[in-house]
């Protein structure tokens, strides 16, 4: 959805149509909630009631908040995080890897990582803006939107701003399929970047 939204905004959209789509989406929210699986409903309830430990998924978020909070400004040091090393924090190598960064490298480490991601997204947007053809620009914007969604979703759920999902943090989370997909999409960006200038033979 985020990829489609990014491409549509870049290609241009009638805001009257956009307004109607948003209104229909808001009206349809109750129906969407009733149609999703029970575990997904519990994740939404857990997000709305983070203090309720009886809701599955809240334990993960609580341990994530403890890990980030205990890291302080500079962190406990690499491989010295108690929540991580003693396995209090579930799925710490993929979904909640940002909490590990917060615990072991502190606020400074988290800010540095977010800064790197921000520059990464900025460079991709520059490539999209400088593309010589509309197709290449839309491809670059679509890939940028995908990376932006993954980054915001993963960090957001780690700090209790967004309901928990299984979205990984690009290039940081453990997982072959995640890294392979990210590298393939980055390849698309590099291909668009290569074609910004005319090649002379």
Each language-model region and where it sits:
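Hydrophobic transmembrane alpha-helices of multi-pass, membrane-embedded glycosylation machinery
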Residues: 1-9, 24-26, 185-187
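Structural signal for the C-terminal ends of transmembrane alpha-helices
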Residues: 5-14, 119-128, 190-196
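Interfacial helix-loop-helix linkers and transmembrane-helix boundary segments
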Residues: 14-19, 127-135, 200
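Hydrophobic, glycine- and aromatic-enriched re-entrant/interface helices and adjoining loop segments
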Residues: 17-110, 134-135
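Transmembrane helix-bundle signature of multi-pass membrane transporters/permeases
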Residues: 22, 100-103, 143-147, 175-178
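Selective detector of the "anchor" transmembrane alpha-helix that sits immediately C-terminal
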Residues: 108-123
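Loop-to-helix entry and N-terminal half of a specific, functionally important transmembrane alpha helix
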Residues: 126-166, 172
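A juxtamembrane structural motif centered on a specific transmembrane helix
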Residues: 153-201
């Amino acid at each position: 959805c985020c990829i489609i939204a990014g491409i549509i905004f870049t290609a241009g959209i009638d805001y009257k149509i956009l307004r109607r789509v948003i209104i229909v989406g808001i009206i349809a929210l109750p129906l969407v909630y009733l149609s999703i699986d029970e575990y997904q409903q519990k994740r939404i309830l857990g997000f709305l009631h983070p203090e309720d430990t009886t809701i599955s998924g809240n334990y993960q978020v609580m341990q994530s908040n403890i890990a980030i909070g205990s890291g302080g400004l500079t962190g406990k040091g690499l491989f010295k995080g108690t929540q991580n090393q003693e396995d209090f924090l579930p799925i710490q190598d993929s979904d909640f890897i940002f909490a590990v960064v917060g615990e072991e490298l502190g606020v400074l480490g988290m800010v540095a990582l977010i800064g790197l991601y921000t520059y990464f997204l900025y460079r991709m947007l520059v490539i999209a803006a400088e593309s010589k053809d509309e197709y290449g620009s839309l491809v670059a914007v679509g890939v940028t939107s995908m990376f932006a969604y993954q980054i915001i979703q993963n960090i957001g759920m780690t700090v209790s701003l967004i309901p928990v999902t299984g979205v990984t943090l690009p290039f940081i989370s453990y997982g072959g399929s995640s890294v392979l997909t990210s590298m393939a999409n980055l390849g698309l960006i590099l291909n668009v970047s290569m074609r910004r200038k005319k090649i002379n033979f």
